[in-house]
Structures are given as C-alpha cells and as structure tokens.
Design a protein with these regions (language model features):
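Periplasm-facing N-terminal accessory domains of Gram-negative outer-membrane beta-barrel systems
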Residues: 1-51
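Structured extracytoplasmic
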Residues: 46, 58-230, 236-244, 306-419, ...
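Short, hydrophobic/aromatic-rich segments at coil-to-beta transitions
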Residues: 89, 226-234, 258-263, 291-296, ...
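Exposed, low-structure sequence patches enriched in small/polar residues
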Residues: 201-203, 327, 336-802
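Extended lipid/amphipathic-ligand handling interfaces
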Residues: 247-253, 279-289
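Short, solvent-exposed aromatic-acidic interface loops
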Residues: 264-270, 298-306, 486-487, 645-648
Length: 802
C-alpha cells in the first residue's frame, strides 16, 4: 500500500524475494518457510534519464468482436442476481466516518505564516492513509445505522442508531447543514445501479445497462484476488469530460460474473468542478449462503477552487463498512415505524463504549482529539470575529449570543436591511427572530420597515407554537406548528411568486418599472403538518385588506367608473402536498431541498366568504401542480418538468383572478416567467408548463477549445394557456361588481388571453462560467404586440455546482 506495507504468501521451494521499484536499486533477500516480518530499504538509483516524449497513435476502438465488451455484456446480464432485493428480507449494519481536512500541506508551508505562529496547528497535522499526503483534519462525523428490507409488500428503512460529530461545524448554529450536505454530495455508491448519484450529479455506472455505449473496456489479465480467480478489466469514458469514471473491475471468473473489487477515479480531463482527485475503492465479500455483498466502500476526494491548487483545498474522506448481513424474517413492527429514516431518541448521546463497539475503523490520534483542537482554535486572538463574519455571510443572520450563551434572538436577514421599490423609494428594514434557545416550542419573528419616499412604516409580526421540539428554527423537518401573524406592507401582485424574501436587495433592480402595487394589511392563522412519509397539510385562515397605490386603481365596471378605495377578503384555504423522499438543509431564513430529485405534488383550494369580517366577495379557487426531475441515461443530463393548472369558479374582480407567475428581476428563478409583465394576463382558467433541459456540457464537451472552458448548456421553454370566462370579463359583462382592467396613462396594461394561443417563452443559457455564473438569453414567441413588453432579455444567476 501507500505506506510500503506488504504481505506475500510463499510456496514450497521459495526461499528468495526480490524487491524493485522505479528509481531504486533492486534487492534480493532470503526468506524462511515460517511467518516472518521482513523490512526492506531500497537505495536510490541515481541514474539521470534522458527526456523521452511518447505520442501514442489515435486509438481505434471497436465494440464489435471485442472480448472485453462481450465479457461485460455477461456481467451486466447477470447483475440482477447480485442485488440484495432478490431476497424476501435482508438487514445489515453500517458504520460511516466522514472526515474533512485541509490538504496540500507541505513541510515548507508548516514553517510559515499561521502554522509557524500557532504550533497546535502543526500538532493537528497527520498523514492521510489514502493519499500519503499531509493533511489537517478539521471535522469528523460518524454515523452508525441499520438497514432493513422487506420484499412483499416492499418496504425499506434505515434506523440511525448513533451520530457523533466534532469539528468546525460546532461554530455554526445550523451546523447539521455541513453533515447533511456532505452525505448528499458524497453519497453511498452502488455500482449495480444503472446510474450512480454522486456530487449531486448522475454518473454512468461501469456495469449499468447503458455502460457498453458509454465506456471503453479492456481485458487486462486473469489474477487471484482474495484467493479467488478474477478477470481484471479497465474502463474509461468515450469522452473524458462526460460524467463517468475511469477504473478497474475485478470480476469472478465463474458463472456468477460477480464483482469482487472495483476501483474508480475521475478522468484527468473531467468536466466535474472543484474535484482534483477522487479515489473510490469497493470490496465485496461472499456470505455463507453464496451471496456477494458490499463490505467496504471508501472514497477520498481532493477539492479546490482551481485545478492548479494555488488557493489550497480540502480533502474529504468517507469510510464505510458494512457488516452483519442477515436474510431472516424481520419483526413486522419495525416496518410500521413512520418514515424511511428513523432516528433513535438517544442517537446523539451514545457512550464511548458504544462507539468503540461499532467503530470498525479506529479513529486516528488527531481525529480523537478534535474537541481539543476546536478549543485551541477559539483561543486564537481575533478568531471569534472571523467566525462572526463568516456566520453572517453564510447564514445571512447576526447572532446575539456566544458559545457559552447560545443566541436566543438572531438579527436578519441581512440582505433585506436596505432595498428599494417604486412606492417606498429607498427602504430600510430591521428583522429578527427568536431561536429554540429562547424556547423549544414558542417562536417569534417580525420586522419593521420604513420607506423614505412614501414616509410610511411597515411591519410584520408572527407568533408560532411548534408541537415538536425544535433544535434551532421552527421550520425544521418535519413541521408541525400553529402560527398567528399580522402585517402591514406594500407589495406588488407578483411578490408572492418569489422563492426568497421580496426585500432581498438583489431583487431591487427590475427589468421594467413595477408601479402598480398595493398596501396590504393581513391577519393570518396558519396550521401546518408534515409527516415523515413526505405528506403535508397546510390550513390557513386569512383576513386581508388590499388598498391599491402607485399607478394601480380599482374602478368599478359601471358607467361612472366608481373608484374603490380598497378590497377586503376573508378566506380559508387547504393545501395538500406530497413529496416522497424529499430532504432538506435548514438555514436560518428557510429550508432548502438538498436535492431536487423528489417528485412534488400539490393541491390547493381557497374559499372566500362575503360578509364574514367585512369580506367583499365569495370566491373559490382550485390549483394543482406536479414537479418532477428526470435524469437521462448515458450522461445526457436532466430535464425538470413542471405542470400546473387552476380555476377561479366564482364571479370576482381582477385582483382575485389568477395571475401568471411573473419574475421581473434580472435574477432567474425556477418555474417563473421572465418576460410577462406584472398582471399582464388575467385568467380564471389556466394551465402552465415549464421544461428545462440541462445537458451538463454534453455539447460543449465535444467542441475544441470551448470544451476547455468547462461551460455547460441548458435550454428552457415555458408556456401558459389561459382564458377568462364572460362572467369575469369586464369587456363582455356589465356586472358592476367587476373592476375595469388596470391602465397606465390611459392604456390597458392587463389583457385577456386567446384560449387558442398560448403564451410561450424560451431561453438558451450557459452556466458554469468561471464555475460561478449562469447567463440566460430569454425570448418571447407570442403576444409580442402587447404594449410595454420586453420581447427578449438577459437573465443571471449565481450557481455553483460540481
């Protein structure tokens, strides 16, 4: 191995061993017939070699009549027999250690700068067991779990028995974010799947159903692996910049064609970002019943911003050991536990004795003393200010506590403290929220804002009771709470479609003037429940007063065009949501899905009550939506698909009609229309569709010069079908309860769609520019004669992906 350790099994008549290595003088030693330890040191061979440049001829690879390809077809054909799911039941134990370290350290670096000034940093340095390089561990996380499976009816659950973490994540209140993201990015690998989910991407498995067309295979040798005869093959992607691996397969040379060992790496010219090196080693073992199962799954990844490592980097090591495979019937009560992942109540408080019993790989000396290292870090002068700034930047909030006295109140979001809009002008806002250190069940949040232009105060306050104890914020999964809120603020109709806060300073710059707004006074009671299966219910009661302002007026559809000062509604709504397998990272501002692989189904119905608490209208609105991501085979990228439909069943004025999901900022956002103006189309029946195709660089990777930039391409199309029935159309009805459509300077700014002509916009984008920037050109294909519209535009987004 990398440490020079070896083991050789001798046979009768063998009495000598010869040791050789490139650049060293060979040495022969005598050995006996008994077990013995032989340590050998080779002397360097100081021979100066002349430079030789080898330029291979371009390879002509053919799948036809290729023995390696024919052999791999048999491996793929037999792989179903090796998956655990062929058994009626199975269970196994799993131990995982995830370590993050600063890498690329050298003896020279350790004698300079901060390492020279603080000796405890040098004391924390160790040699990586996988790369043989100097590293400085900064985080270690251990997880002990048990997985159980039942075939009929199919059910699979993972029971987390213990979790243990030490390191820099202790400095962050949402420290579980690091562990959650690391586990998702460096996920478990099953080469028997067609695609391997890794780095939040999909890689083609070397034994996947599409592998023959994606990889080149080469037969190398027949050799013994763990006393079993195996066929050794190597594989490389047809195009090294596609999302695939290079590596070695060791397949049993018998009728099972089972994989006994697999090593995988990323190609040197890979299109993957931030990864300079990745080593994956999997070992399989045979059980007494003949099954071959995964025993070891180890991964080492070197990360840095650029490939030449001038900025330094990190190393992530994931060590995973599987044991105690069993195929006996399992107690049925375990399958009745809620959720696919069950966390034992004492998983965070397991004893040292417990970890010693389940830890199949001992901690290194530096890993064991991680808590001491963290304490020494805190003693560095000025370190707390560095952490304070880093937390404010990453979490977008400022804490009011300290390590000994955790924050009970956080100030933020920081990016909403100053913004601007047409009514407020320059707007200043101060926001805050209590945390679980204030109370595990009761939470408060709110803000106060002031606009220099309209000289009005705006405010919002919310009181929430969580039925579940929370660790830090109220929206941790699964949510179960009751809240009451009251707010008074200025809003545009499209603000409700934003995924982020409407006062985000980066959204202040619009592609067109948004001058049709309202002062909204809301009183809301909200109940929300989520289950571990991904099912959620949200029930809401809301009383709203809507006072138009700016260039927005409410004029009755009568001869006098009577001005309406405001509209009051009293409504109740119920939303059902189902997203099986969805997982989240908790930030202080909101929950963020770890990945977007889970399908999402929603159904909402809202009812308005005329005469209840001053409500002006009855209304009934129903909306449904489906969102799904589809990964294409053979590294052809992914398609995100969204379909929505809805209807307003009653006669209502235009503020209560259904608006398109418009986004008039320069920041692109999923599922919104970039070129539809504020309230441009008013419908009481609609259907919309969004398709986004991310090719992951499949085209650019085949264009000379361009492929060196590692740019990636994407295509998007969005469509909206809508209609307005005569009863809600002020141009076809004399009903005075309706309002005239909005105008600006005497010209209408809202329109009725032709039910036979959908609104369509498309975009072509390039992302991964400098590994950071997403640029998208958007074009409007229909309704191009509407006044005041943009027919095309450029949109941006900061996007970091592997």
């Amino acid at each position: 191995n990398a440490n020079g350790e070896y083991q050789v099994e001798t046979r009768k008549g063998w009495d000598e061993l010869t040791f050789s290595a490139v650049g060293y003088i060979s040495k022969t030693v005598r050995v006996g017939s008994n077990n013995q330890t032989v340590n050998v040191k080779l002397a360097p061979d100081n021979v100066l070699l002349n430079e030789v440049i080898v330029k291979p001829q371009k390879e002509k690879y053919s799948r036809k009549n290729n023995p390696a390809v024919e052999f791999m077809k048999k491996v793929i054909e037999h792989k179903k027999a090796q998956v655990l799911e062929v058994n009626e039941y199975y269970q196994y134990d799993k131990y995982e250690k995830m370590k993050m370290s600063i890498n690329d350290l050298t003896p020279e670096k350790l004698e300079k700068g901060i390492y020279k000034k603080y000796s405890f940093l040098r004391d924390q340095v160790e040699v990586s067991e996988t790369t043989n390089k100097l590293i400085l561990p900064i985080s270690v996380q251990e997880t002990s779990s048990q997985t159980i499976y039942r075939k009929n009816p199919e059910n699979k659950k993972t029971i987390i028995k213990g979790k243990n973490s030490n390191g820099i994540e202790e400095f962050f209140s949402t420290g579980d974010m690091l562990g959650t993201v690391l586990k998702d990015v460096f996920a478990d690998i099953n080469i028997y799947d067609d695609d391997i989910r890794l780095l939040q991407q999909r890689f083609v498995s070397p034994i996947g159903n599409n592998a023959i067309s994606f990889y080149k295979y080469y037969l190398m040798d027949t050799l013994m692996v763990n006393k079993r005869e195996c066929v050794h093959l190597t594989f490389v992607p047809q195009n090294s910049q596609d999302f695939g691996f290079t590596g070695h397969l060791y397949v049993l040379n018998d009728s099972t064609y089972a994989v006994q060992k697999c090593t995988m790496n990323l190609p040197k010219k890979t299109g993957v970002n931030f990864v300079n090196r990745m080593d994956i080693v999997q070992q399989y073992e045979q059980l007494p019943n003949g099954n071959w199962v995964l025993a070891d799954d180890d991964m080492t990844v070197d990360l840095s911003w650029n490939s030449n490592k001038t900025a330094g980097g990190l190393q992530v090591e994931r060590t995973t050991k599987y044991s105690n495979y069993k195929f006996d019937p399992i107690e049925q009560r375990l399958f009745r536990l809620k959720g696919s992942v069950i966390k034992e109540a004492d998983m965070l408080s397991k004893s040292d004795e417990y970890w010693a019993s389940v830890r199949q790989v001992p901690l290194t000396k530096k890993e064991s003393s991680m808590d001491v290292f963290v304490n020494r870090l805190e003693q560095i002068p000025g370190f707390k200010y560095i952490i304070f700034g880093a937390k404010a930047l990453i979490e977008n909030f400022v804490e009011t506590g300290s390590k000994g006295h955790p924050s009970k109140v956080d100030i933020g979001p920081i990016n909403t403290m100053i913004s601007s809009n047409y009514i407020d002008g320059t707007r200043f806002r101060l926001s805050g929220m209590t945390t679980a250190h204030f109370h595990k069940h009761w939470f408060l949040n709110g803000y106060g804002a002031y606009g220099l232009k309209d000289e009005r105060w705006k405010y919002s306050g919310t009181v929430t009771y969580s039925f579940n104890k929370r660790d830090y914020v109220v929206w941790e999964f699964p949510k179960h709470y009751l809240s009451a809120s009251y707010s008074y603020d200025v809003m545009s109709p499209m603000d409700k479609f934003l995924f982020t806060d409407k006062d985000n300073i980066f959204l202040s710059v619009k592609t067109t003037t948004v001058d049709q707004m309202s002062y909204m006074r809301d009183a809301t009671i909200n109940y929300e429940l989520e289950t571990l299966t991904g099912f959620g219910v949200k029930a809401m009661l809301r009383h709203r007063n809507d006072e138009p302002t700016g260039k927005l007026e409410y004029l009755r559809n009568d001869a006098a065009q009577t001005r309406v000062h405001d509209v009051t509604t009293s409504e109740a709504s119920l939303t059902l949501r189902y997203a099986p397998g969805e997982s989240f990272v908790n930030s202080k501002q909101r929950r963020v899905p770890v990945s977007l692989d889970a399908p999402i189904f929603t159904l909402t119905h809202a009812m308005g009550f005329k005469g209840v608490l001053g409500g002006d209208y009855n209304f009934n609105r129903t909306e449904a939506s489906v969102w799904k991501r589809f990964w294409l085979p053979a590294s052809w990228g992914k398609i995100d698909c969204s379909v929505k439909a809805g209807a307003e069943w009653n006669t209502v004025p235009f503020p209560l009609l259904i608006l398109p999901e418009a986004n008039l900022s320069y920041i692109t956002q999923r599922e919104t229309f970039n070129l539809i103006n504020n309230m441009e189309f008013l419908n009481d029946r609609y259907a919309s569709m969004s398709l986004s195709y991310d090719m992951n660089g499949k085209l650019f990777n085949r264009i000379p010069l361009i492929k060196n930039l590692k740019w990636r391409e994407m295509f998007r199309v969005r469509a909206l079908w809508g209609t307005l029935t005569d009863k809600n159309n002020p141009f076809k009805s004399n009903n005075p309860d309706l309002f005239r459509f909005p105008t600006r300077d005497g010209k209408f700014t809202s329109f009725v769609m032709d039910p036979k002509v959908p609104y369509i916009e498309g975009s072509v984008g390039i992302y991964n520019i400098f590994k950071l920037l997403h640029v998208e050109y958007v074009h409007r294909f229909t309704y191009r004669d509407n006044p005041g519209i943009n027919k095309n535009g450029i949109r941006f987004m900061v996007l970091m992906v592997f």
